[in-house]
Amino acid sequence: MGKAYYVKFETPEDLVNPILEAVRVASTSGKVKKGTNEATKAIERGTSKLIVIAEDVEPPEVVAHLPILCEEQGAAFAFVPSKQELGKSLGIDITSAAAAILDAGDAQHIVDQVVSSIAKIKGGKTDQ
């Protein structure tokens, strides 16, 4: 099965673990919002450092607006293959379609590296 239509770029495998690690560390030492609705609000308010979106969300319409909104607002975003892994990184026992890192806490250097790497992949379009 191919990637969902909302996946705007291929996240390299060697970047997936740092993204999940950033979520894990930020959720304990910083501030992270869980879920699509919270991620949407963080983008609209301009408070997100990084939006993380799962690639295996069904139906895809649940998160399809997030990449578009991120591009409109200049917010950094990345994809991870599994909503299960994203939920686990958030420290919750259920899946999560999306998450927003508001304050990276001890993960700031990881978030900076991820945002920089994503900007290179996208051709420098990420403003953060």
Swiss-Prot record:
Main localization, broad class: cytoplasm
GO CC annotation terms, alphabetical: cytoplasm; ribonucleoprotein complex; ribosome
One of the record's GO molecular function terms: ribonuclease P activity
Pfam families cross-referenced by the UniProt entry: Ribosomal_L7Ae (PF01248)
Localization per Swiss-Prot or TrEMBL: Cytoplasm
UniProt xrefs under InterPro entries: eL8/uL1-like (IPR050257), Ribosomal_eL30-like_sf (IPR029064), Ribosomal_eL8/eL30/eS12/Gad45 (IPR004038), Ribosomal_eL8/Nhp2 (IPR018492), Ribosomal_eL8_arc (IPR022481)
Disulfide bonding pattern of the chain: none
GO BP annotations, alphabetical order: translation; tRNA 5'-leader removal
Purpose of the protein: Multifunctional RNA-binding protein that recognizes the K-turn motif in ribosomal RNA, the RNA component of RNase P, box H/ACA, box C/D and box C'/D' sRNAs.
HAMAP family given in the database record: Ribosomal_eL8 (MF_00326)
Protein name: Large ribosomal subunit protein eL8
Native source organism of the sequence: Nitrosopumilus maritimus (strain SCM1)
